UniProtKB/Swiss-Prot annotation:
InterPro entries linked to this entry: Aldolase_TIM, DeoC, DeoC/FbaB/LacD_aldolase, DeoC_typeII
Primary role: Catalyzes a reversible aldol reaction between acetaldehyde and D-glyceraldehyde 3-phosphate to generate 2-deoxy-D-ribose 5-phosphate.
Active-site positions on this chain: 102, 165, 199
GO annotations of cellular component type: cytoplasm
Name by which UniProt lists this protein: Deoxyribose-phosphate aldolase
Catalyses which reaction(s): 2-deoxy-D-ribose 5-phosphate = D-glyceraldehyde 3-phosphate + acetaldehyde
Origin superkingdom: Bacteria
Subcellular location(s) of the protein: Cytoplasm
Gene3D superfamilies named among the record's database cross-references: Aldolase class I
Enzyme class at the top of the EC tree: lyase
EC nos: 4.1.2.4
Origin species: Aliivibrio salmonicida (strain LFI1238) (Vibrio salmonicida (strain LFI1238))
Length: 258
């Protein structure tokens, strides 16, 4: 197997296969769940809006892939600074049966100089999650500056985040290798590689992209770090490219381009 094929297979099993469109339907989510099961293995998770968690759970169970985890989003996509709403949404996501919650950090408040609200929001959402995995989206493309990206990553980790995630996929600039490096360096420098993972999201579209991101993680945190409890790709169109690289066809084409 070529290096690119090996990276493609590795990336496929680390994917949070995503649909977060305003016009999503039960049918779209069922199709997404079907795509999570491939001839070469399953994606790590599907990522969907909270209201679709029950239909996703039913579909994954019926197709014999209950090990595919269900991630959902809260405080999404704007990252508002109302802690009570973010916590209520997170509690609702848990009640729906989500295995993982991706919450948006109140990044605009941080840009304006308020570090406290973000820490409290993440801390209380993690308390609402209990053992459920909490990924925190910091919206790197809006923070832009290295100092802000590193500070936000640090706040999230100190507040109890299980993962730090680059982006919502809903702003002009989403995951970039430069931003990924900054966030991985925070995980390394804080000594939390055992307990904190990383998720680039939005803009990872090809096997070559995924290979470069994984090589960076291997370089910074070691070759055995990026397993599915420490690394995820938030993507949709990536899956088709990975399957093409592996010379496998998907059951249904995914028209989204997250």
């Amino acid at each position: 197997m070529s290096d690119l094929k090996a990276a493609a297979l590795r990336a496929l099993k680390l994917m949070d296969l995503t649909t977060l469109n305003d016009n999503d339907t039960d049918e779209a989510v069922i199709a997404l769940c079907k795509n999570a099961k491939t001839a070469v293995g399953n994606t790590a998770a599907v990522c969907i809006y909270p209201r679709f968690v029950p239909i996703a759970k039913k579909t994954l169970r019926e197709q014999g892939t209950p090990d595919v985890r269900i991630a959902t989003v809260t405080n999404f996509p704007h990252g508002n600074d109302d802690i009570a709403i973010a916590v209520a949404e997170t509690k609702a996501a848990v009640a729906y049966g989500a295995d993982e919650v991706d919450v948006v950090f109140p990044y605009r408040a941080l840009i304006a100089g308020n570090e406290t609200v973000g820490f409290e929001l993440v801390k209380q959402c993690k308390e609402a999650c209990g053992d459920i995995l909490l990924k925190v989206i910091i919206e790197t493309g809006e923070l832009k500056e290295e100092a802000l990206i590193k500070k936000t990553s640090q706040i999230c980790i100190e507040a109890g985040a299980n993962f730090i995630k680059t982006s919502t996929g809903k702003v002009p600039v989403n995951a970039t290798p430069e931003y990924a490096r900054m966030m991985l360096e925070v995980i390394r420098d804080m000594g939390v590689a055992k307990t904190v993972g990383f998720k680039p999201a939005g803009g990872v579209r090809t096997a070559e992209d995924a290979q470069a991101y994984l090589a960076m993680a291997d370089d910074i945190l070691g070759g055995d770090w990026a397993d599915n409890m420490h690394y995820r790709f938030g993507a949709s169109s990536l899956l088709t490219n990975l399957l093409n690289t592996l010379e496998v066809t998907a059951e249904t084409a995914d028209p989204s381009a997250y």
